[in-house]
Amino acid sequence: MIFIDACFRKETPYTPIWMMRQAGRYLSEYQESRKKAGSFLELCKNSDLATEVTLQPVEILGVDAAILFSDILVVPLEMGLNLEFIPKKGPHFLETITDLKSVESLKVGVYKQLNYVYDTISQTRQKLSKEKALIGFCGSPWTLATYMIEGEGSKSYAKSKKMLYSEPEVLKALLEKLSLELIEYLSLQIQAGVNAVMIFDSWASALEKEAYLEFSWDYLKKISKELKKRYAHIPVILFPKGIGAYLDSIDGEFDVFGVDWGTPLTAAKKILGGKYVLQGNLEPTRLYDKNALEEGVEKILKVMGNQGHIFNLGHGMLPDLPRENAKYLVQLVHAKTRR
């Protein structure tokens, strides 16, 4: 698999490409699958439809890897927090974590309940071309914790940070509990058939450096270290969004570092490129315009050259991006990097 070879810095015929949120609303096929499911959460839980959606961007765009269609919040959902998705607003938990008692009341061993995820993986792997990789994923402990404490997405993360500074032991108990679940959750994804795993730390930038390293990065390192110990042949990709200023403190046992669009690729390459393969980092809105897209691709390829790079966006696809430009991006990267 070209994608897996690239994760391990092996020679590839061209630079592989996939896109975060490549299965999404910009595809009419996705909209149809979502309509059939009835709701976003039901789409995640319906393995037949989730498989369909996972495969769509591979078939339509020609990307080199599929990423499992699911949501990072299925883990806290199964741990006992009722979840709803509010149209135009996003996820909302009906209960939140407020103290040690609420942390202790969370169910453990819920990775065993996520069979709908593993069924999607095994179905997708059966239908996916042997040349294409399937990526599994989860959210980072810190990012999941913020949703569980705030109850929804936040601009200030005030409740989460208040807990971090005034009751750090409560937050650490939650992060520890989540970490243990996530290690087993990703392990079962691997056993079900994924070829690589990725951890999304979407709200990494909410924390100052010292707090980030202690309350997020340390837990990411713990998870990736255990996974590499169990499955050395499976690449681990970490994507902590918005921590370009903290790159000099990044270390640990993983294979690929996801670079967001706000972090200069030159800096990431200089600091991390010798140790980790870099993934990224086209600004997603460049897909609105072909000239802007071409310019962005040119800049990235000039910095990264032929090895140690997986092409991706620096964040997720937007719902109204023109699909023909997404397809063009894949063709462009393949053509420009063919060795």
From Swiss-Prot:
Enzyme class: lyase
GO terms assigned for molecular function: uroporphyrinogen decarboxylase activity
Pfam families found in the cross-reference section: URO-D
SS bond list: none
Pathway membership, UniProt: Porphyrin-containing compound metabolism; protoporphyrin-IX biosynthesis; coproporphyrinogen-III from 5-aminolevulinate: step 4/4
Keywords in alphabetical order: Cytoplasm, Decarboxylase, Lyase, Porphyrin biosynthesis
InterPro entries linked to this entry: UROD/MetE-like_sf, Uroporphyrinogen_deCO2ase_HemE, Uroporphyrinogen_deCOase
Family label: Belongs to the uroporphyrinogen decarboxylase family.
Record's protein name: Uroporphyrinogen decarboxylase
Annotated source species: Helicobacter pylori (strain J99 / ATCC 700824)
